[in-house]
């Protein structure tokens, strides 16, 4: 956190500067397999099971595997391509893959977290609870469906084209909890969902290919559409949306959106004014409804 100026100034340097070490333990088991038939058809798959002290103790989630499967078809090795005399087509391959990958947020813990400090005024020890325990802490999962193609023409032009859909679930986001538990009525839990759809194109052309010299031009383009599909907790104060945009999300918006008031100009006294949630022009200090702010970018 950020300490107040008075608090920081009055503390000795040895109390402010500190070094700490953080250690986590992992154990993994994985399996990979692949098979290619007649240099034309290929299948591959992988499975991985991982355990870490960052996961919760709930047995329902502890041993969920991450896995992927894929297939490819090397069209240029088919007889009908060779019989057609398509010498200009050096390589053309189609690919299809599907899999589930995982990510673990090391800022969260399945255990009750607290930090210890000494009061500036009483010199007494203070312990502040940070996060409640979470036995269901688990992977942030992303399922990816990808269709792609690779090609080479005339021995000089190479490229690839991919279309994908990525759906992320069990994302760590703020979740509403019983206010009587404390923690500002919210806690981080695997409760968010997000979707990405996009395309990627990559091209490369060899203008000059010599033993000791080459000249190549490359081109890449990509498009991605992102949307938050599920979030359990939405703030009730517009200021929270602007102060902490990376901790507060609105369903239907994009990830890491930035929010702002709709500016309505200056009042007769020179003070700034904005539009509230109903479109009325009022003083900026009076607007606290989250529906009064809009997404202005990322």
Predicted regions located by residue number:
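Extracellular/periplasmic, surface-exposed regions of secreted and cell-surface proteins
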Residues: 1-262
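Short acidic/glycine-rich loop or secondary-structure boundary segments that cap or lie
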Residues: 227-229, 270, 284
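C-terminal segments of large proteins
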Residues: 263-268
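Structural flexibility/helix-modulation signal
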Residues: 272, 276-278
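Long, low-complexity, polar/charged, intrinsically disordered or flexibly structured peripheral segments
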Residues: 278-297
């Amino acid at each position: 956190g950020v300490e107040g100026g008075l608090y920081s100034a009055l503390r000795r340097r040895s109390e402010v500067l500190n070094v700490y070490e953080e250690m986590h333990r992992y154990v993994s088991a994985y399996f990979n397999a692949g098979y290619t038939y007649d240099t034309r058809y290929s299948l591959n798959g992988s499975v991985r099971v991982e355990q870490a002290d960052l996961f919760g103790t709930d047995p329902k989630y502890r041993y969920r595997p991450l896995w992927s499967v894929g297939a490819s078809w090397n069209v240029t090795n088919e007889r009908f391509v060779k019989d057609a005399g398509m010498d200009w087509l050096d390589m053309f391959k189609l690919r299809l893959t599907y899999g589930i990958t995982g990510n673990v947020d090391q800022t969260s813990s399945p255990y009750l977290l607290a930090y210890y400090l000494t009061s500036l005024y009483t010199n007494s020890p203070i312990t502040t609870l940070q996060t409640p325990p979470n036995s269901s802490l688990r992977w942030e999962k992303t399922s990816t469906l990808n269709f792609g193609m690779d090609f080479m023409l005339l021995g000089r032009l190479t490229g690839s084209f991919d279309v994908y859909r990525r759906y992320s679930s069990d994302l760590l986001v703020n979740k509403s909890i019983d206010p009587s538990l404390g923690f500002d009525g919210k806690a981080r839990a695997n409760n968010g969902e997000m979707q990405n759809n996009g395309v990627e194109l990559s091209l490369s052309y060899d203008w000059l290919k010599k033993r000791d010299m080459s000249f190549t031009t490359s081109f890449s383009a990509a498009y991605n559409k992102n949307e938050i599909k599920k979030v359990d907790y939405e703030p009730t104060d517009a200021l929270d949306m602007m102060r902490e945009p990376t901790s507060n999300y609105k369903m239907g918006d994009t990830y890491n959106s930035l929010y702002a008031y709709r500016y309505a100009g200056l009042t007769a006294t020179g003070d700034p004014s904005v539009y509230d949630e109903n479109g009325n022009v009022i003083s900026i200090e009076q607007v606290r409804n989250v529906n009064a702010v809009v997404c202005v970018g990322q």
